[in-house]
Regions:
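Compositionally biased, charged N-terminal/linker segments
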Residues: 1-46, 120-140
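Short, charged beta-turn/beta-strand-edge "cap" motif at the junction between a beta-strand
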Residues: 54-59
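Aromatic- and Lys/Arg-enriched surface recognition patch
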Residues: 61-125
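Short beta-strand or tight-loop elements
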Residues: 46-48, 64
């Protein structure tokens, strides 16, 4: 991934390890997520789009859409990214996304074990964005 072809970051959440109940009650994902210390973490910038992908759930898929809210920080020896990700009223499920042929190549399908953050390309974002409810994320 490069800044030129980045459509949005994806933060994945496994509800077997990170409970969803408090996030659902609050209507948004938690505000900080652990990410891998690699070249991707150095590409993250405030204002970039970020999607919230829930794994290991009968309705796995995109549960929220928002923005990176600040610079990556070190907390407890690990990198964290600050975000604001309002949850969608209903998730856009993996099954729904797979009906769009070109979205089958999304990294979350090709490499589901990839550490946070995953990403979608600008081309994938163009196909994905109309499937999301109005989120105010259209502009870069």
């Amino acid at each position: 991934v490069t800044l030129d072809d980045l459509g949005a970051w994806i933060i994945k959440c496994n509800p077997r390890k990170t409970p969803l109940e408090s996030m659902r009650a609050a209507g948004e994902a938690r505000s900080s997520w652990c990410i891998a210390d690699n070249y991707r973490s150095r590409l993250i910038r405030p204002g970039q789009r970020v999607l919230f992908w829930v794994t290991s759930h009968p309705r796995r898929g995109i549960w929220g859409a928002g923005r990176v809210t600040g610079d990556v920080t070190v907390e407890g020896g690990r990198l964290h990214v600050p975000v604001r990700i309002p949850l969608l009223a209903e998730p856009v499920t993996a099954a729904e996304l797979l009906t769009v042929g070109a979205l089958r190549a999304m990294e979350v399908f090709r490499s589901p074990q990839q550490a946070n953050p995953s990403w979608v390309s600008e081309k994938e974002w163009t196909l994905l964005e109309p499937l999301l409810p109005a989120t105010g994320m259209a502009a870069g």
